[in-house]
Amino acid sequence: MEFNIKSGSPEKQRVACVIVGVYESRKLTFAADLLDRISNGFISDVIRHGDMEGKLGSTLVLHSVPHTLCDRVMLVGLGKERDFRAKEYREAVRASVKALTQTSASEAVSYLSELTVKKHDVEWMIEQATVVTLDALYRFDRFKSKQDESVREPRKLTLAVPRRSDLADGEKGLQRGLAIGNGMKLAKDLGNLPGNVCTPSYLGEEARKVAETFGAEAEILGPREIAELGMHSFLSVAKGSAEEARLIVLKHHGAKDKNDKPIVLVGKGITFDSGGISLKPGEGMDEMKYDMCGAATVLGAFRAAVEMNLPLNVIAIVPTCENMPNGNAVKPGDIVTSMSGQTIEILNTDAEGRLILCDALTYAERFSPATVIDVATLTGACVIALGHIATGLYSNQDSLARELLAAGEEVADRAWHMPMWDEYQEMLKSPFADMANIGGRPGGSVTAACFLSRFAKAYDWAHLDIAGTAWKGGKDKGATARPVPLLVQFLQDRADIALGNVVRRGRPRREAPEVADDEQD
């Protein structure tokens, strides 16, 4: 779909649909009020008769509104004005896009992006409208023999800004939103692919395509090179499958000084997780294709960063393989030596994500990173603790944790800081090796993070457990692309710091605009 930024009065838009908002108090937004006045109270009459109450997310499409040039006017409920914040704004935008796909309108102009959201500016409004729109329009129908013709994606969406002087900021927000949306689409596409398509080698080739498209560096290592690095923990998982392992390394040299310490993103890439010899139950095992969503979101965030050409050095590392139970598979009780030299007793082969991540974390040391963030669908225990709302966040630096929490809040991709006290480390003791790969059922998400922390002592490190947030089940089944928005916002914040800018946290914006004659298109 094509996006555009425009400043102009709603009644002068010769387009298939104009989108405006209505509050629950029946108060019209600035753009809706302009349409109401030009139509001699047509919209007010509709509201007065109770056809639109303004409840958040409700929509009503009006045809042939008098004295306007558009074919339709869509009214979107915004809820109570005093409660209208970032969350409500996103919900209203999403509702408008969903309703638009149920019409035959091929073009629309949305004035929701002109609304006032406390502490947020034009750039943020446009960015978020773009991200939400792309997310709402996303469909994964690659393997459908027939397309769903009941949903019609508009050809063009124009997002309105209050004044001509806002066009430049609006364009910045649009480009950021497109980059984030494209990164999310990549993450969702990779996550939704079946395991017989999205194999480790396929993931490696898709990563290479991203690098080639944006001029980044790509290095894809196979089993021989991985073994030469001493990544025997990683390979212990991979050897149970006929699919060969890959270690994907992508590099973006965006900083002025190419020697600046990079930010390293590490993503767990188990393209299918049967559990190995510690076999999972059959029910729901199909969803274990999503066990590579850590890898998918790291690649998605990397794609967004390079598309935005962030002035940072960013490296993505993805260890990827299958966890399968063939005759060569690792067994409970086996002991392996990690790349770091630390030995691991494998008590449960279904705790395999940490076994591939630990070697990737050791590998990251060679880049002398400023920060390392690993992302993984690591533990069911995190789902029990936090449900499907928040990502579990662990870190060896509280300041880094605060940065990530703030980034997540800014873009509605929330995380929660979990404890990682020394007492939990005791649960990983093994009588035969330096550590066991599990610490028992209690505190399973914490002990998994504690395990990883033993391989991340050389740098500032954070771990995002996305087992509860990476995908949805049920009727809305599919990958969510979380935490791509959080990661990209974090990278943008670090880029602002590198440039000496104040970290962008929703700069205050003007109140409802007054549209002057010379500002109308």
Swiss-Prot record:
Where Mn(2+) 1 binds, per the record, is at 273, 350, 352
Q: Which UniProt keywords apply?
A: Aminopeptidase, Cytoplasm, Hydrolase, Manganese, Metal-binding, Protease
Coiled-coil stretches noted in the UniProt entry, renumbered to this chain: none
The answer to whether the entry has keyword Hydrolase is yes
The protein's matches in HAMAP family, at most eight in alphabetical order, are given as: Cytosol_peptidase_M17
So what does this one do? Presumably involved in the processing and regular turnover of intracellular proteins. Catalyzes the removal of unsubstituted N-terminal amino acids from various peptides.
Q: Could you tell me what this protein is called?
A: Probable cytosol aminopeptidase
